[in-house]
């Protein structure tokens, strides 16, 4: 069995809400959020969470650093500030503690996450800058002690929305320190148009180069209707994809996607039963929707 209670309070510029749950595991999980608007252009948030290592619920979903509503407690602090016009500055810091062993950590461990972003919009142009620093304890090579894995990721992006068409340029960089230091970057360009009657076309292309798997680059990619993905890239290569939407009638919707990843540093992709004896991978998707 499982049961939970939701609660909340709001007064003026202050709001509080939360949820506490338990069940047949006889353990507790709770998350509580507070926000306060200090000024018309400045808001702060505080999130406290505690998920017992014994707690279990089949359909539980909540904010967490470890990806599960279990074996975690932590505090999140964030703020949004609009100093002027189209500029939005955001920052958050999150500290988490995992009292029991987890993947790649054979004893209690900790993690720290910080992110700063700036978004400036003027007319049809949007400029974005982001920096993230994350530290997480993991087992050393001999599994005799925990050491920190430190990830630093930065992004610069420019988006121009021309109404019936748009174009976006983006540069990602990463530095990872875990046993050794590794670096990586990716430069990508994407755009699309809806100017052609009944059609919508989107295309992306990106070049990536990383030292190894630890410095993998994650990049957003459009997918089918109601779908998207954040594939990871490591090594050296190019990723390009094309998406075409066709709406011949109000009831029929056709969408196709073709994408290819060409690697310059290997002659095989994947391992074991998923190994491909080639330096490239191609994925093709087709979706049809009919409204009754």
Predicted regions and their residues:
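Exposed, low-structure sequence patches enriched in small/polar residues
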Residues: 1-292
């Amino acid at each position: 069995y499982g049961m939970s209670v939701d609660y909340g309070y709001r007064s003026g510029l202050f709001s509080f809400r939360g949820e506490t749950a338990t069940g047949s595991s006889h353990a507790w999980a709770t998350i509580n959020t507070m926000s306060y608007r200090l000024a018309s252009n400045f808001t702060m948030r505080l999130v406290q969470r505690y998920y017992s290592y014994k707690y279990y619920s089949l359909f539980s979903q909540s904010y967490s650093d470890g990806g599960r509503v279990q074996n975690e407690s932590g505090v999140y602090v964030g703020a949004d500030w609009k100093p002027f016009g189209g500029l939005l500055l955001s920052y958050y810091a999150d500290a988490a503690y995992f009292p029991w062993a987890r993947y790649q950590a054979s004893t209690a461990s900790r993690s720290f996450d910080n992110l700063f972003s700036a978004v400036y919009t003027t007319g049809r142009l949007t400029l974005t800058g982001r920096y993230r620093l994350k530290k997480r304890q993991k087992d050393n090579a001999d599994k005799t002690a925990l050491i920190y894995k430190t990830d630093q990721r930065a992004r610069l992006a420019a988006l121009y929305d021309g109404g019936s068409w748009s174009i976006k340029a983006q540069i990602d960089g990463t530095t990872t320190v875990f046993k050794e230091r590794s670096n990586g970057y990716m430069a990508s360009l994407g755009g699309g148009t809806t100017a052609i009657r009944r059609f919508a076309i989107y295309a992306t292309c990106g070049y990536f180069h990383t030292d190894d798997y630890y410095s993998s680059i994650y990049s957003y990619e459009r997918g089918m209707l109601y779908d998207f993905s954040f594939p990871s890239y490591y090594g050296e290569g190019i990723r390009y994809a094309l998406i075409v939407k066709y709406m011949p009638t109000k009831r029929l919707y056709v969408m196709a996607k073709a994408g290819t990843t060409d690697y310059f540093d290997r002659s095989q992709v994947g391992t074991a039963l998923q190994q491909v004896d080639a330096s490239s991978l191609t994925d093709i998707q087709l979706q049809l929707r009919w409204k009754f």
